[in-house]
Amino acid sequence: MYAADLKRAVEYDLEQERMFDYGGLSTDEIIRHVSRFTANLWQIHAFCEGNTRTTAVFVIQYLRSMGFSVNNEIFARHSWYFRNAMVRYVYKNNEGVMPEPKYLERFFRNMLLGEQWDLRNRYLVINPPAEFAEQPRLDTPTSPMQTEQAPNKHRTSTEQAPNMFYTDDK
């Protein structure tokens, strides 16, 4: 995408958002819309690096301007989940994989409503093994709760900064 195309895409999304009326919407509808807006803005991918971080900062500022009390804590703790949830929101292919908004909506439900969805990437996998097929909500007794960390039978992350934060103060 060229700079002019990127500018037009960003301007289009921002103009659509400017024209959107949040009045009278339920909390679920607001979260649904904010999720869509966030994923669409992220999908433009205006930068070589830092698109997810930039989107997170923008969303924090935007939600604050709407009166929400938010900070970057959830983004810092679950940045990879946030990025992958946006991928799942917009991704489709010829093999029947369709966009799935629920993961990004659950991220925002945790942030805005204090819900406790388990925000681990294993639940975003397409065609996951049975034990990861249903993302648990940790604050409801009817949700499939996991009382302990699932075994590392299925790798869910790569070690990008191995032991860099370990200090041995002997």
Task: Annotate each predicted stretch with a short phrase.
Residues 1-170:
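FIC/Doc superfamily catalytic core
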